[in-house]
Amino acid sequence: MNCIFLGPPGAGKGTLAFEVSKSYKIPHISTGDLFRAAIKEQTDLGKKVKAVIDSGALVSDDLTIALVKERLERDDTKKGFILDGFPRTIAQADALEDIVKIDSVINFDISDDEVIKRLSGRRVCSSCGQSFHIEFVKPKKEGICDSCSGDLMIRPDDKIEAIQKRLETYRNQTAPLIDYYTKKDLIVNIDARPASEKVLASFKVKFPH
């Protein structure tokens, strides 16, 4: 099962991909993870990627395509994979066609208001990286990490202005992919509003294994 998870930031793509990867035994390939690896190496390229992500904009097609192609060439993708966060543009989708055959494109259906509510409430520990949410996963003590007592912070790309910019970018550049893959009869719509357990159950009904 070679599939793409398509949807705005905050739609729950990463959460569902983790569960599907575990259940179906196929790798979850996130461009976010690929970017973070580049940033961690602190190369000139990694620093450029960090600056772009922090601003809420998108990394260039050429860089993203090269990172994804390299990952898809590994042996663990032979039985299938989940692409999360790629492609984001028609140009990337065209490039992907030259690399691998896609079986299904899962479209996460969710409103912008719900995305803003989810993302603006996220908090991350500045020390250990554990994630919380002011509404859904509250820390025991406001502003303090349950695990290490570190200070909780808002990531630059979780600030409302950055979220709105990311959503605008998504609607302008990525949403056209829905039409692109609809014409290829690959789109499968999933309601991304319910809790993650219900979204997973819906996925398993559509893709029994």
From Swiss-Prot:
Residues 121-158 are annotated as: LID. AMP binds at T31, R36, A57, L58, V59, G85, F86, P87, R88, Q92, R155, R166. It is an enzyme of class 2 (transferase). Residues 30-59 are annotated as: NMP. One of its GO terms (cellular component) is cytoplasm. One of its GO terms (biological process) is AMP salvage. Transmembrane segments: none annotated. Its EC number is 2.7.4.3. InterPro entries: Adenyl_kin_sub (IPR006259), Adenylat/UMP-CMP_kin (IPR000850), Adenylat_kinase_CS (IPR033690), Adenylate_kinase_lid-dom (IPR007862), P-loop_NTPase (IPR027417). Consists of three domains, a large central CORE domain and two small peripheral domains, NMPbind and LID, which undergo movements during catalysis. The LID domain closes over the site of phosphoryl transfer upon ATP binding. Assembling and dissambling the active center during each catalytic cycle provides an effective means to prevent ATP hydrolysis. Some bacteria have evolved a zinc-coordinating structure that stabilizes the LID domain. PANTHER family: NUCLEOTIDE KINASE. This is Adenylate kinase. It comes from Treponema denticola (strain ATCC 35405 / DSM 14222 / CIP 103919 / JCM 8153 / KCTC 15104). The gene is adk.
